[in-house]
Amino acid sequence: LSATAIESNLRQIYPVLMQGFKTAGLSVGTPFFIKYCRVGVMNDIGDLLTPDVLILLIGERPGLGRAESMSAYMAYRPQHGDNDANRDVVCNIFEGGGTNPLEAGAFIVQFAQKMRQNQASGVKLKLAAG
């Protein structure tokens, strides 16, 4: 997956996320880096750290045409056995043609709040939120 995507977008999106979570009264654990991870690692992280909401910033596959395209995968209380139906994603985050990183950061904060309010993510969130 594309490391260029993280390098290209993290400086813009990270401060928006941190400020947004602070303003919303949401606590944030220590961010960390996982080399060569895939989206399924969210289940392992969920089992170990038991967060209410987990957000994974990950570069899209370089073969998709834009090496700087990043996605934010999100899950409410992820755990072993969860699959894509239990997750939400904000994709195609990059400046100059994709979702602007600043706008994506604000949206991710709002979405995390929605997950906590409804205690759900993925298909369950869509059903709970109507």
Predicted regions span which residues?
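Conserved mixed alpha/beta catalytic, RNA-binding, or beta-rich assembly cores of soluble enzyme
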Residues: 1-48, 65, 73, 87
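Short glycine-rich or small-residue beta-strand-to-loop segments that form or flank ligand, phosphate
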Residues: 1-4, 55-57, 91
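Sparse, context-dependent recognition of short Cys/His-centered cofactor- or disulfide-binding micro-motifs
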Residues: 30, 57-59, 75
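Hydrophobic alpha-helical bundle architecture
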Residues: 46-57, 61-64
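C-terminal functional extensions of proteins
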Residues: 62-68, 73-130
